[in-house]
Amino acid sequence: MDLNDLLLQQQEVTNLLSNLQEAHKRILISNEDENNDLNKIRKDILICLNDLKTVNSLIIDPRDGLIKKNLHKLEKYEQELRSLESEEAAIESNLNQWKIDQDPENVRRKENWGTVPINLVGNHQYLLESYVNEVGIENTTLANTNGNHEETPNSSKFTREQLLRNARKLKLCQEQVNSEIDQLKSLISQYERDRNVINDEYNRTTELIQKEVNTLSREEDKINSQREKILKKLGLLKDHEQNQPRNFFFSLGALARVDNSDFKIALSQAYEFIDAKKQALKKILHENKSQTMSLEHNFSIWNDVIRSIQGLETNLQQSFIEKEGNVPKTDITSMISRTLSRVNSIVGTYSKDSIFTSILCELKALQKALDELNGKMQPIPIKSSAKTPELLQMGKSPPKVALSKEYASNLHESTEDFPLKINKTD
């Protein structure tokens, strides 16, 4: 049985007991003949006391009590969350190690790269500079800013030999620059091939890295999935698979229930919630442990009291049968006095808990009957009690509230605000 259901049932039995005691008091002080109802109420009170005793035992049992089980669950959830937290930290550390440094300068500094000179066979610039220096830049197309290739005014200064020599030098320079361009084109083609290889290898390598990252991310998702299950068990996240929401008997008002979308908020509250719930459970355990002796005592005393009173009723009934209703007043007063003394001795100095109020009502009723008898001359006929209807006894586990069928129907007025339920045993 769930602890919250048991705590709710404990409260229901407590409320029922209070209603029964009110009805018990009302019948004892009334002048109406409700002897049958009185006997049923006495037994129902005894059953409620036994139910409370049984519920108390189920709550505080040191071996398999529900408080111990729930505390064990909370400690287990806390350990699992901390273990998952450690696993997540390890995964985050691994993920950080798989990050690619996006700044090439950092890699260059780590690798301590140098420069690679590009050597070309030939030097057309030397020949070109030699030619320009020989003819003068003003006599070349470099000085023609309009792009007009017509003969310049100073071209007539060159002799035939100079023009032929310049032509040979320019021809050589032309051949050289073409050769160097071909070398550069070949180098560029090689660089492009290298670039393609680099790109292919980079993509392949990053795919391998991404696979490792994805594997770690899936592990992280599994951790969050396990966390989500724990948070749902704790009640910090709503479980959409459940059709009906769970109602808790005791609530921790300081911690607001979160929505299913607020996973991070719920996770941040988990340890605080577990600690608060553990404290609440320990408080309930302490309260119920402090009531154990009282519940045992209440049941024992009330059981002895109603046995004494039922013994009085049986003796009076037997006397009336044997003496055909003509029982001397002295015999009646003697039996009542003995019962009164016996009940007083059972109670002793005990005056704790609400059950003492019901015992006190029985004592007052006995004393009132004794006073009335002492004030009258003729014997007072006392009607025999009808056979008490059977009560639906509470099973051992789970506990069920025991009620007589007749009482459930006769006590509508006093239990109007408290629906009585008869639970069948499984």
Curated annotation (Swiss-Prot):
Coiled-coil region: 64-101, 165-230
Localization per record: Cytoplasm; Membrane
Principal subcellular localization: cytoplasm
Keyword list, A-Z: Autophagy, Coiled coil, Cytoplasm, Membrane, Protein transport, Transport
One GO BP: autophagy
Keyword Amino-acid biosynthesis: no
Superkingdom to which the source organism belongs: Eukaryota
Membrane topology according to the record: Peripheral membrane protein
Record keyword Protein transport present: yes
GO annotation, cellular component aspect: cytoplasm; membrane
Function: Required for cytoplasm to vacuole transport (Cvt) vesicle formation and efficient autophagy. Plays a role in ATG protein retrieval from the pre-autophagosomal structure (PAS) and is especially required for autophagy-dependent cycling of ATG9. Also plays a role in regulation of filamentous growth.
Protein family: Belongs to the ATG23 family.
Name of the molecule in the record: Autophagy-related protein 23
Source species of the chain: Kluyveromyces lactis (strain ATCC 8585 / CBS 2359 / DSM 70799 / NBRC 1267 / NRRL Y-1140 / WM37) (Yeast)
Gene expressing this chain: ATG23
